[in-house]
């Protein structure tokens, strides 16, 4: 599927591309230009019913398919993703807006997830213990759980779906994916390549839409589990409604990630890492650096360095060479971001770099330049809320103790970083910070696919996180067999 031919995005159900029964459509925009590039249907619960029934029917045979055959299909799928790497990256840039280099990196992360899923059979093995009593042995066996529903966001249209469905189907489940209605084109291409890899009909299904599709998955009795990534309010809703309907749910939510810079930090390194973490992907990622807490003695130096580096950032269409900062996803998100900048000024923060004034902001597309506030306090909205945009807040502190105390007062706890050369400070940080993913002298501490991904508090709802052994646990159920064999 190409942007030129994708006038109306279809659903993918039972191995067929079918039109939604809904006549309601939503425009898909190129956020760098504001141009409409496709129309996506706002599908109904009837569409969801068709997809779930197709997935349930496919589960009967797919769950019995030999594990090595499942793995071979995923290995072939991985190679097809590699073969189409540049096309996939360009498609991400066109419908999401991030720079081509960042999109290229996202494709890599998606490929790594598929590689992990292809090797997951080694993690799916059960456990046995002979002679738990005379002549008696026990064993644990893993089995798939059925139809899985996946609900994914706009900001990583390849990586997040690849967190979910490859591992789920490797474990023998079938899958119904609801991609973001803002970025449906990449998901469609992923399905095309999965079919080319030999994935049987009905194992992967896609239903495009919004609220009705989400509720359809949450309410359907044949859907046994829900994987979700998105905003905090929706994550909480998905978790509550899904568990009310007796489903397993993992819901990855919002973030307000703190980066702590101590007096002994390498400021050149810290500056480069923070700039990339704060303004990469236009700040639209759950691992973005949102707040910097810096010790007072070096605060002026760090602020000066950050502003100087931010001034060098090239803003524009992500397909253009040298562009680092692309647009935010939609015009209303641009307006929301500008509202937060206004709020920061009104509440007394010092605006040291104003992203509203960049030339690109005044043209076509949904651009907001890199914005930096100094002298931010925890009473301000720009400290409290997830802005999900290129806005960085700087809080000045007297000590590591104070920095950790401030970070721990956030309702979010996805990621946190520290810049220091002190092992003792790193240990204190590791032991006392309330966050799920930690970094030392790195800006984005996102783990590889073979480790669990997610945070604490209002950044995550559930028990088993995405990826790694948590993912295998989430997508399988166990049977215990105790046997007596006497001579």
Curated annotation (Swiss-Prot):
Pathway: Polyol metabolism; myo-inositol degradation into acetyl-CoA; acetyl-CoA from myo-inositol: step 7/7. GO terms for molecular function: malonate-semialdehyde dehydrogenase (acetylating) activity; methylmalonate-semialdehyde dehydrogenase (acylating, NAD) activity. Disulfide bonds: none annotated. NAD(+) binds at residues 154, 178, 181-182, 231, 386. It catalyses: 3-oxopropanoate + NAD(+) + CoA + H2O = hydrogencarbonate + acetyl-CoA + NADH + H(+); 2-methyl-3-oxopropanoate + NAD(+) + CoA + H2O = propanoyl-CoA + hydrogencarbonate + NADH + H(+). It is an enzyme of class 1 (oxidoreductase). Catalyzes the oxidation of malonate semialdehyde (MSA) and methylmalonate semialdehyde (MMSA) into acetyl-CoA and propanoyl-CoA, respectively. Is involved in a myo-inositol catabolic pathway. Bicarbonate, and not CO2, is the end-product of the enzymatic reaction. Belongs to the aldehyde dehydrogenase family. IolA subfamily. Homotetramer. This is Malonate-semialdehyde dehydrogenase 2. It comes from Bacillus anthracis.
